[in-house]
Amino acid sequence: MKKWLFLAFAAAFSLSVQAQELTENKEYVVVEGQQRSAQPEVIEFFSFYCPHCYSFEAQYHIPQKIAESLPEGTSFKQYHVDFLGPQSENLTRAWALALAINAEEKVKIPLFKAAQTNALKSMDDIRQIFIDNGVSAEQFDGGINSFAVNGLVTKQQNLVKKYQVRGVPDFYVNGKYRVNMEGLAHDENHFIDEYVQTVKGLLQK
């Protein structure tokens, strides 16, 4: 019993120390002119054309690890930027559709693979990826220009402007803090852990 209490205390103390040890302009930067969000949230901005975003998703699984570690009641959203690649605007719209119909996990990796190999020449190519991965043609055609999808396209674009996103992947916590990738460990294993712990620590600030 004493050992269990000690371990529980040590774990809680460790989390507290992690939050306190985060240093502004090292592990994170404060986003100028932004207020803390009303509800706890983590937002990732990414592009299907971005090789680092692809590595984050498919190799290092950083978004998944962050999502799995978040406290109850914390939202995690991934939003696409449309300033990279020839089909980036179409991909932002397609991602909005995926969000609207809860098809993110069906199409995310296939879209990454296609964009990384420059296989996307038009919205028709994107449409085929959706169909090949479990979204019906009727769902795609009926939703891609719908009111809900138009709203999500605008939301993604407005948030990119709001946070002045210039590069990806880019993570924002509670609308006020941005994870500073350059300030984290450079070796792979420590980098992944530090990234996740930085997000968790910023949620406590």
Model-derived segments and spans:
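Structural cue for short, hydrophobic secondary-structure segments
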Residues: 44-46
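C-terminal cap of thioredoxin/glutaredoxin-like
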Residues: 133-205
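Extracellular/periplasmic catalytic domains that process cell-envelope and extracellular macromolecules
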Residues: 36, 70-71, 87, 162-166
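Structural alpha/beta surface segment adjacent to cysteine/selenocysteine redox centers
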Residues: 48-127, 198
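A short beta-strand-turn-helix
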Residues: 24-42
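Sec/Tat signal peptide C-region and signal peptidase I cleavage site
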Residues: 13-21
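Sec-dependent N-terminal signal peptides
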Residues: 4-13
